[in-house]
């Protein structure tokens, strides 16, 4: 799971350095941040970066994830996420809607985002194109009271708790056809500025995403290979992830193992299975830039999918329960 505030998370290796970073950041009048979280399970959490994916399947889709970066370091980044989306019929057309909540703790910063998503799902070239919009409320907090350095009475340093809010907009396109999908999206389109107290501002930079994936069927009908990729940039920091998973499916169980590679950043191992109808996934990200393998990132994912029978009269009948 990747995340950054002006300087990449990968650079925050020691508590002392983290504290110094926060003082430097808060000692200027404007902070520019690209702090979006990208999860290792991005292939199951597409609405987290592309609202066009809302309602793409005729199912109620509920996801939750918890990620802990740089295990073993004090004040290490930790993120909690939960979302739900589903399709619905209105005026003889298919739409998608969703809700999303994210809480991201990075040192003395706390980022909270509550979002509503909408997508218009249209048939195109034998597949489905989702055109999505997202409206978010950003709530930012910095707790300067926890600074452990003696900064005296210098007014340039924020040594109290400061809060701020802002409205944010995102948009995305998501196209899927049989075993293939591709998506483009942009978050923080208006580059919202959050006032933190009277002296400081948090500038949230726009970020851009591209994703694609394809499922390969093997001779053994119980096996298939799912490949996916995600790239994003804010104009300063760029990251790409390439993932492959081997899926085993039988009448009574489903499980997978896989690996993800991010050039110059990390290698991630992925494991997942269905447990009593709930899909559970685990990922461990090992950094390749000098951080000890034991100080990698842990991520836990839980997913639930329920089939919906959406008829033209607008009645949604729950026929059966199926899972990833």
In which residue ranges do the predicted regions lie?
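Bacterial Sec-dependent N-terminal signal peptides
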Residues: 1-36, 244, 271, 306, ...
């Amino acid at each position: 799971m990747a995340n950054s505030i002006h300087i990449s998370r990968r650079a925050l290796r020691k508590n002392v350095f983290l504290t110094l970073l926060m003082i430097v950041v808060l000692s200027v009048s404007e902070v520019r941040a690209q702090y979006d979280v990208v999860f290792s399970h991005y292939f199951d959490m597409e609405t987290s970066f592309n609202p066009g994916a809302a309602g793409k399947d005729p199912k109620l889709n509920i996801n939750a994830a918890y990620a802990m970066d740089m295990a073993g370091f004090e004040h290490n980044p930790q993120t909690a996420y939960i979302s739900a989306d589903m399709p619905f019929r209105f005026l003889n057309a298919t739409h998608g809607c969703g809700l999303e909540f994210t809480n991201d703790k990075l040192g003395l910063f706390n980022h909270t985002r509550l979002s509503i998503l909408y997508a218009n799902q249209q048939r195109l070239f034998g597949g489905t194109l989702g055109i999505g919009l997202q409206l978010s409320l950003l709530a930012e907090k910095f707790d300067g009271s926890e600074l452990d350095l003696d900064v005296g009475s210098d007014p340039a340093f924020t040594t109290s708790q400061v809060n701020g809010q802002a409205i944010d907009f995102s948009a995305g396109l998501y196209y899927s056809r049989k075993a293939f999908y591709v998506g483009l999206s942009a978050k923080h389109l208006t580059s919202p500025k959050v006032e933190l107290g009277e002296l400081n501002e948090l500038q949230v930079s726009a970020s851009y995403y591209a994703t694609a994936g394809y499922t390969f069927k093997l001779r053994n009908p119980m096996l298939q290979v799912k490949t996916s990729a995600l790239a994003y940039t804010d104009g300063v920091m760029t990251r790409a992830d390439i993932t492959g998973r081997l899926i085993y499916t039988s009448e009574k169980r489903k499980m997978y193992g896989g690996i993800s590679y991010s050039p110059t950043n990390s290698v991630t191992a992925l494991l997942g299975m269905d447990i009593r109808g709930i899909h559970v996934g685990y990922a461990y990200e090992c950094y390749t830039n000098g951080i000890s393998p034991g100080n990698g990132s842990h991520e836990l994912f839980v997913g639930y999918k329920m089939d919906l029978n959406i008829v033209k009269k607008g009645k949604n009948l729950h026929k059966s329960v199926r899972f990833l």
